[in-house]
């Protein structure tokens, strides 16, 4: 109310340069322009993509920037022409928007809305400017969301209005990781009942992939990870077996082919490593196996396999945000969670105050957390 149309001064975690810890700074957040929404972020989680960009490996990474793309909050104000949300609405910012009228949105085969893709990749709002400043300097936006700030501004096509009873410190995770892994199984792979699946990488996305395989009726779900401590959690989400590549002296794809009478029906690479991407494809069954790439590999890395792997009937696919058309799907995923059909709370291993954000990056790198939720 008192802030509408005014610049808001608030706390944010600023990444001034690659490879350095984030700094908690006071920043200025300009009011939303036409077709923009200013959101008070209530909770945000830290995802591997944030740390990937912070590390400097991201070809689209720009600095200084406000990172963060797994958040939830309350609309503070809207710019002119905004009809999808109003002040007071509970929302999840979306790093893949849904404008509803580009040729991607009109095609049922994809969720990759292109309406604001170019400016989003440049770290700017659709009008090619930023809403963030700090110490007189422009700060870039990140993935169209920038949730590591008490207030953020997003395009009106990059916001999903959700059930107002939903706990924001939990459903923020549906803004990326859980939706991504779960959708990779149910939308992209379209896992069938009775199938055998292998999930490489048992972080948040991999666990969500396991949950998706189970929901789709898979009977064998094999978790693959170098960290044996991850298996207990994987079992809770539905994994039936666990294998550790360190325990074998032959390639893990050969181990999987041996364990599954010729290979798995579906495999999921939830790490972002081109070598495991190859292993995941080659672990698939001849004639019908499908491997889905979910993890994002560092810029410039390339995948390799022998073409014969594909000639003999394997399929290699990729997915972004689990194939969900965001504006229409995220509210439904929140409803599924509210109806206890989707695990979300179980992904939260740590909760910290926002000013301890660097600690949450450390927990993630040490493999100690699945998701750490920060609250303001």
Curated annotation (Swiss-Prot):
Location of the protein in the cell: Cytoplasm
Catalysed conversion reaction: a primary alcohol + NAD(+) = an aldehyde + NADH + H(+); a secondary alcohol + NAD(+) = a ketone + NADH + H(+); S-(hydroxymethyl)glutathione + NADP(+) = S-formylglutathione + NADPH + H(+); S-(hydroxymethyl)glutathione + NAD(+) = S-formylglutathione + NADH + H(+)
Pfam families the record matches: ADH_N (PF08240), ADH_zinc_N (PF00107)
GO biological process: formaldehyde catabolic process
MF (Gene Ontology): alcohol dehydrogenase (NAD+) activity; S-(hydroxymethyl)glutathione dehydrogenase (NAD+) activity; S-(hydroxymethyl)glutathione dehydrogenase (NADP+) activity; S-nitrosoglutathione reductase (NADH) activity; zinc ion binding
Binding-site residues for Zn(2+) 2, renumbered to this chain: 99, 102, 105, 113
Enzyme class: oxidoreductase
Keyword Zinc found: yes
A GO term from the CC aspect: cytosol
Keywords: Acetylation, Cytoplasm, Metal-binding, NAD, Oxidoreductase, Zinc
Keyword Nucleotidyltransferase: no
This enzyme's EC code(s): 1.1.1.1, 1.1.1.-, 1.1.1.284
Cofactor requirements of the protein: Zn(2+)
Role, per record: Class-III ADH is remarkably ineffective in oxidizing ethanol, but it readily catalyzes the oxidation of long-chain primary alcohols and the oxidation of S-(hydroxymethyl) glutathione. Also acts as a S-nitroso-glutathione reductase by catalyzing the NADH-dependent reduction of S-nitrosoglutathione, thereby regulating protein S-nitrosylation.
Protein name (record): Alcohol dehydrogenase class-3
């Amino acid at each position: 109310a008192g802030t509408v149309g005014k610049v808001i001064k608030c706390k944010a975690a600023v990444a001034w340069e690659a490879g350095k810890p984030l700094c908690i700074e006071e920043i200025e957040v300009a009011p939303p322009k036409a077709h923009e929404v200013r959101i008070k972020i209530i909770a945000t989680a830290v995802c591997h993509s944030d740390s990937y960009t912070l590390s400097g490996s991201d070809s689209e990474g720009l600095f200084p920037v406000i990172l963060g793309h797994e958040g939830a909050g309350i609309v503070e104000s809207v710019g002119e022409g905004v009809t999808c949300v109003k002040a007071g609405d509970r929302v999840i910012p979306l790093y893949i928007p849904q404008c509803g009228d580009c040729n991607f949105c009109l095609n049922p085969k994809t969720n990759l809305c292109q309406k604001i893709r170019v400016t989003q990749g440049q770290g700017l709002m659709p009008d090619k400017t930023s809403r963030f400043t700090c110490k007189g300097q422009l700060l870039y936006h990140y993935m169209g969301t920038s949730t590591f700030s008490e207030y953020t501004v997003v395009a009106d096509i990059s916001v999903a209005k959700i059930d107002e009873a939903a706990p924001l410190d939990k459903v923020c995770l549906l803004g990326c990781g859980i939706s991504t892994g779960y959708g990779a199984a149910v939308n992209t792979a379209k896992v069938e009942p009775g199938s055998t699946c292998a999930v490489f990488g048992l972080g948040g996305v991999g666990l969500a992939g396991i949950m998706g395989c189970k929901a789709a009726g898979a009977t064998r779900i094999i978790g693959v990870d170098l960290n044996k401590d991850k298996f207990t959690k994987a079992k809770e989400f539905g994994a039936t077996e666990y294998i550790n590549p360190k325990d074998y002296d032959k390639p893990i794809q050969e181990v999987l082919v041996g364990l599954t009478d010729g290979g798995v029906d579906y495999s999921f690479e939830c790490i972002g490593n081109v070598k495991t991407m190859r292993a995941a494809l080659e672990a698939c069954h001849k004639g019908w196996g499908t491997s889905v790439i979910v993890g994002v590999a560092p810029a410039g890395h390339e995948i390799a396999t022998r073409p014969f792997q594909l000639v003999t009937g394997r399929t290699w696919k990729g997915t972004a945000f689990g194939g969900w058309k965001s504006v229409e799907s995220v509210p439904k995923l929140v409803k599924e969670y509210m109806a206890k059909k989707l695990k979300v709370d179980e992904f939260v291993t740590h909760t910290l105050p926002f000013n301890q954000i660097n600690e949450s990056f450390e927990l993630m790198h040490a493999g100690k957390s699945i998701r750490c939720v920060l609250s303001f």
